[in-house]
Amino acid sequence: MLKQQRFLLALIALLVVGALIVVTPFGKQYGLGKINLGLDLRGGSQLTLQVNPTEEVKDITPNVMEAVQTVVANRLNPEGVSEIVVQTVGSQQILVQLPGVSDPKDAEQLLSQVAQLDFRRPNNAILAQVNVRSSELQRLLQKLPEAEKAGDAAALAKLQGEVQQKQKQLTELQDQFFVKTDLTGEDLNDAGYAISQSQPNKWDVTLRFDVDGGKKFAALTKSLAGTGQPLGIFLDGKSISQATVSDRFKANGITGGAAIITGNFELEDAKLLANQLKGGSLPVPVKVEEIRTVGATLGQDSIRQSVYAGIGGLILVLIFMGVWYRLPGLIADVALCVYGLLTFACYVLFGVTLTLPGIAGFILSIGMAVDANILIFERTREELRSGKTLYRSIESGFYRAFTSILDSNVTTLIACGVLYWLGSGLVRGFAVTLGIGVAVSMFTAITCSRTLMFTAISLPNLRKIELFDSKRAVS
């Protein structure tokens, strides 16, 4: 038991030190140390998007708007923790709110493309014509130096005209060189970016297909393996990569459901393309109609007063716990401070953006953390008054309260999961902050409070029943 307490104390100390590093300015050198505030707390940018019909999608129906809204949200907020608000306005417009973003160029660029990815194979009928036109063009190009030396202006002009004509014909044929296959961006599960293994200081875009997409990719690469014909990867109809497939894949093609786009990308371009593909392709193009800078809903004075009120309320809770529950209350105060530190560290690590609903979720989780400690201490008092020893009372108090705490927190986490799954924007933010707070409160109430309590009673000066219950005399 003593070894276990020492281990848990060391773990708690390690977590506290790690959390301090994360939430303090020291963490800024690692890209941490800062909690993002939402649009209602610090302002930001607001984009109005116009959804435009196409020849394929002539009517912008509610289903189309819902699909566009989902893709926009997935592109701008792939992890689902930044409180970006994406909502429809009218029949053909979408409003996007970006908290804390004063220059939304990245967001505008992220939404500028439909991002329809497709894989294409060479058209064998066109391939023969391309080879013929390429040979003819090469022969004409070889004649140019001789014509220039001859000094016959008319003959040179005629030859240059023929070269331009052949180049035009070749370009037209090359536009038809690739034909679409059934492998598209719809078959992707995920997309990312990684440092290129073949080109220094360049980046590749990594793709992972779903089960059907993996099978299609294997079949496509098998048919091209060893032929010398390129596999074309196109984005919105433009070629972004062409690669040949080695003959060692003749038997089964490239299996495993993964692919790499080696397009000589810079980091920002690779990240942009990966986020576009991860978010999915837009069913119709969108155009940024308006960009506005939005001020915070609450002024600085209101925010400052709210912070003071929150700190004052927390101090009153800490004082009440210490006065009413004596030593266990003081231990609970320490556990609550650890809880707050760990929770804020989680918010920083997960990139959570705090808004007013998010703060409400955090405050609610504090209440649940206090409630868990109260359950434990009341159970402990009951055991003490029944005549049990101090150690047995504490052990039994934690054991009897555990089921109630677990049931309460699990049901809350289920509710948070439902809100996160079905909600969006501010509702998701409330669910995330509450869910993280509840999960951390379970750890601090059961592990932190328990470890500190047993550590306290291991000290002779603190092993006194009157420090736990004033109504029971010292035995």
UniProtKB/Swiss-Prot annotation:
Q: Where are the transmembrane segments?
A: 7-27, 305-327, 334-356, 357-377, 402-422, 429-449
The task this protein performs is described as: Part of the Sec protein translocase complex. Interacts with the SecYEG preprotein conducting channel. SecDF uses the proton motive force (PMF) to complete protein translocation after the ATP-dependent function of SecA.
Family from the record: Belongs to the SecD/SecF family. SecD subfamily.
Please state where this protein is localized.
Cell inner membrane
Recorded GO cellular component terms are: plasma membrane
The primary site where this protein sits is membrane
The upper taxonomy is: Bacteria, Bacillati, Cyanobacteriota, Cyanophyceae, Acaryochloridales
Q: Got any disulfides in this one, which pairs?
A: none
Q: Give the way it sits in the membrane.
A: Multi-pass membrane protein
Keywords from the UniProt entry: Cell inner membrane, Cell membrane, Membrane, Protein transport, Translocation, Transmembrane, Transmembrane helix, Transport
Q: Which NCBIfam families match?
A: 2A0604s01, secD
The protein's name: Protein translocase subunit SecD
Task: Share what the entry says about its subunit structure, partners included.
Answer: Forms a complex with SecF. Part of the essential Sec protein translocation apparatus which comprises SecA, SecYEG and auxiliary proteins SecDF. Other proteins may also be involved.
| Any one GO molecular-function label of the UniProt entry | protein-transporting ATPase activity
**Recorded coiled-coil stretches:** none
